[in-house]
Each structure stands twice: as C-alpha cells, then as structure tokens.
Amino acid sequence: VISGGGQKSISDSTSAATFNSRRQSSTIELSGVTIDNTATNLTVQGDGSSFINVKNNSIIGYDIYITRLELGGSSGSAGNYSYRNIRGAVQIDDSYNMAFVVGFSRNIAKIGVNGTCIMADTSTSSLKSISVNVQDRNNVHNLWSASVTLHEVISETTF
C-alpha cells in the first residue's frame, strides 16, 4: 500500500524558496525462515528474492513490527516467540551510500529469546534496496514476519 504526498513542487509561505520532491508512505510485508545462525534478509511476501527498492537523495523513516516464531529444530522450542518494534531512519545520498540510525527499539512480548533484527542495505550493482535482516541461534527453526511502514522524502536536490 502506497500513499502519495501531494504536489511535487512545494514552497514556504512567502514563496521565497521552492523545492521539488516526492513524499510518500507505504506499508510492506516481509517474511522468511531461518534454520541456523546465518544472517538472513527477509523478502517481500516471502518470495525469496524481492527487497524494498529505494531512490537516491532520500530520507526514509521506518517503523518495523517483527514477529519471530520458533517452529522446532534440535535446539528450538516450538511455540517460543518474540515480538519487537524498531524505529529509525536511513539517509541515502546521491551515490546510494546508506547511513542507518536506530532511534527506538523495544521488546513488546516474548517467550524465549529475541534473536537479532536490523534494517540493512541489500543493494546489488543494478538494484538499490533495503530489507530487514534477522538472525537467531544455530539449529533453531524460525518463521519471521515483519510489517514495515516507510515514510519517504525523495529530493531532487543532490546530497
């Protein structure tokens, strides 16, 4: 789901300064499975290959709600879970260098452990993207599900 942010060209109240930008918000569902302690990038709808595409010269605020459900494994306990909320932002410059800042991280509920979760750069040379990167213990089978809300400002000014 994507919601647009109005006019492309916006000015201050006196029209002394006008800037061209796109503003939008979106909610994306990411999911995936881990069976060992390998760091894993969640994919859009769990398709195994799609991440969240990004534009340069942008600021993206993110709000992640993520659930980790243990489903077994030799070291896992089926039914253990964690539910967390992580908020932050990423600055993406003209060359697609990304600077991530976490402003808030909270454990909402859990039985067992949390695992780890961060927003990460998943770019290739031809497609620039981000995703939620997750990791837990070896020999634990987990189903991960994340609802990610983004607030994007994409500027035509280079930085």
Residue ranges and their predicted role:
Residues 1-44, 146-151:
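Periodic small-residue-enriched repeat registers in elongated scaffold domains
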Residues 35-37, 68-79, 111, 136-145:
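Short, surface-exposed beta-strand/loop "edge" segments at domain boundaries and coil↔beta transitions
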Residues 44-92, 146-151:
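Beta-rich globular "head" domains
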Residues 49-52, 66, 115-123, 133:
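Short amphipathic beta-strand and strand-loop transition segments with alternating hydrophobic
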Residues 122-136, 141:
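Noncatalytic modules at the cell exterior or secretory-pathway interfaces
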Residues 138-159:
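C-terminal interaction-tip segments
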